[in-house]
């Protein structure tokens, strides 16, 4: 599980620990961790692991896929009694069952599912858990109230947000001067720079996003209508699924 030119990686402090710490990453149940149908979260997780100085320390857990990424450690899990618990909590229970008889990870990173992070913390309060947020948590189960977010922040080791906006959403209504608020941090998504020089550009705006209300596609379309009203040489393309 290594990148091309992996020998050029800088040495990480984690490399010298013995035994090396293991970091488990739990995906939302709808994510498909493979090159064919990877969602946005799967893509980000895959890229971040490969960009890490210690990619071999990560283990990704998620719904079974026919062909997972072959350059990152992946363990497929079938949600436990999804008919009763729901699919995401069922996946969390399958993960907890997987831990039985195995060494505990140094960190459990739960992506995008606040109620899953809370559930794992309630069952295994001894496990350090990082909640990784890609969207507004105020619309999510398990964090849609100030009280719920206060409870989350107490039980999480850290809350990682992909933007300052998402960080502000999580802290909305909370006392930002409280020491616990320092657990909420921003870690922006990166991108690999493929081009050595700027390419020639055309007057086109490309929007790659799910076409659903929570992604703000309607507000975006309305804004573009106003901005481009007197710019007939510009055009817009939108690429994205409607039901994912």
Describe these PLM feature segments.
Residues 137, 165-166, 184-195, 242-243:
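Short beta-strand->alpha-helix junction loop in the catalytic core
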Residues 172-175, 235-244:
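Short, structured helix-loop element that forms part of the nucleotide-activated donor/catalytic region
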Residues 109-116, 133:
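Short His-centered aromatic/hydrophobic patch
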Residues 23-24, 160, 191, 197-215, ...:
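Conserved donor-binding/catalytic core segment of Leloir-type glycosyltransferases
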Residues 141-143, 171, 185-203:
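Acidic anion/phosphate-binding donor-loop and adjacent secondary structure
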Residues 3-16, 20, 26-35, 44-86, ...:
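N-terminal strand-loop element at the rim of the active site
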Residues 81-107, 117:
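An amphipathic, basic-hydrophobic alpha-helix
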Residues 142, 149-182, 193:
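A short, active-site helix/loop in glycosyltransferases that binds the activated sugar's phosphate group
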């Amino acid at each position: 599980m290594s990148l091309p030119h992996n020998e050029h990686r800088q040495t990480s402090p984690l490399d010298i620990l013995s035994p090396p710490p293991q970091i488990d990453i739990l995906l939302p149940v709808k994510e498909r961790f493979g090159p064919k149908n990877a969602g946005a979260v799967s893509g980000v997780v895959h890229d971040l692991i490969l960009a890490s100085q210690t990619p071999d320390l990560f283990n990704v857990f998620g719904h079974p896929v026919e062909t997972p990424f072959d350059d990152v450690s992946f363990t497929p899990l079938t949600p436990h009694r999804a008919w009763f618990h729901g699919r995401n909590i069922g996946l969390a229970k399958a993960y907890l069952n997987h831990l039985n008889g195995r060494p505990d990870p140094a960190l459990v990173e739960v992506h995008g599912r606040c109620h899953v992070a809370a559930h794992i913390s309630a069952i295994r309060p001894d496990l350090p858990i990082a909640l990784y947020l890609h969207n507004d948590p105020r619309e999510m189960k398990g964090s849609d109230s100030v009280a719920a977010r206060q409870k989350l922040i107490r039980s999480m080791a850290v809350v990682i947000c992909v933007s300052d906006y998402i960080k502000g959403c999580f802290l909305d209504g909370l006392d930002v001067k409280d020491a616990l608020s320092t657990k909420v941090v921003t870690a922006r998504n990166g991108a690999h720079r493929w081009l050595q020089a700027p390419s020639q550009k055309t007057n086109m705006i490309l929007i790659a996003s799910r076409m659903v209300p929570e992604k703000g596609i309607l507000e975006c379309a309305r804004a573009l209508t106003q901005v481009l009203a007197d710019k007939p040489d510009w055009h817009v393309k939108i690429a994205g699924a409607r039901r994912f």
